[in-house]
Regions:
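Short secondary-structure capping/junction motifs at helix and strand boundaries
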Residues: 57-64
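Long, positively charged leader/targeting segments at protein N-termini
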Residues: 1-19, 23-27, 66-212, 216-249
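Short peripheral tails and domain-boundary helices/loops at the edges of structured domains
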Residues: 30-57
Length: 249
């Protein structure tokens, strides 16, 4: 919320690149025999976030994790009986839980299980093997994937193409080789709004600036892509009036 007048183009804050949590800034890339880029933008960031989260106080992003949500009630976490209430809605086919879990178990789960010192088991488990271990691994991966879906930014490179929105799970085949994703501390404090926005940012130093004049007590609204209502519901479980004009008819 603005406390005083803010001019058009005035700098609000700047986030240095090294403060962004990403596959490039995390030390995990130097500890694995795998190339994180092989996992694509979504799964590589999920793996990095699991690693940094499990490091606890040793992670430079520990304070950031403390302000991020730990529990979600978005559609990815609904039970089959709860999802039955949405039968007939197109959103059911866009959740992609099964495909997301298949990708997690086929790609990042072997890395996690092979490196128990980097990824210590949670909840008192001896390992991530077995039914209990697999479920614990899926739970933490879904949590990180949901955080990314709700809060992550695209980190553009000159050679990158524009990234398209995932329609199923956390990643589509078309997304491979496109923009990396990163978690930007402090930027999460800005409300996202598809229409009534007055704050934008410029890569790669994450320079956040106003592009309209502020009056005192006017809230900051971060520029976001215009998304259909079904995708907004899947990511954030909200039905904000700003997105109603972008609903599929």
């Amino acid at each position: 919320m603005a406390q005083s007048d803010i001019a058009d183009g005035e700098e609000l804050f700047t986030i240095p690149p090294e403060s962004v949590l990403s596959a490039r800034t995390s030390g995990l890339k130097d500890l694995l025999s795998h190339d994180l880029n092989e996992f694509g933008p979504w799964l590589s960031l999920i793996l990095v976030m699991i690693y940094e989260y499990l490091r606890g106080e040793q992670s430079a992003w520990k304070p950031y994790f403390t302000v991020l949500p730990q529990n979600f009630d978005t559609l990815m976490f609904w039970s089959p009986s709860e999802l039955q209430e949405l039968q007939g809605s197109a959103i059911v086919g866009k959740i992609g839980k099964q495909s997301a879990e298949e990708m997690i178990l086929e790609t990042i789960a072997p890395v996690i299980r092979k490196n128990p010192t980097l990824f210590p088991p949670v909840d008192g488990l001896a390992s991530y093997d077995g039914e209990a271990g697999t479920q614990a691994l899926l739970n933490i991966a879904h949590t990180m994937g949901s955080i990314i879906m709700a809060y992550a930014f695209d980190i553009e490179n000159p050679e990158d193409e524009d990234e398209q929105d995932a329609e199923d799970g956390y990643m589509t085949d078309e997304e491979e080789g496109q923009s990396s994703k990163g978690m930007v501390p402090l930027a999460d404090m800005l409300n996202a709004d598809a229409d009534r926005n007055n704050v934008s940012f410029a890569n790669v130093v994450f320079f956040f600036y106003s592009f309209s004049c502020f009056l005192p007590f006017q809230p900051f609204k971060l520029t976001v892509s215009i998304l259909p209502g079904s995708l907004v519901s899947r990511r954030w479980l909200v039905d904000h009036e700003s997105y109603q004009t972008h609903q599929a008819r």
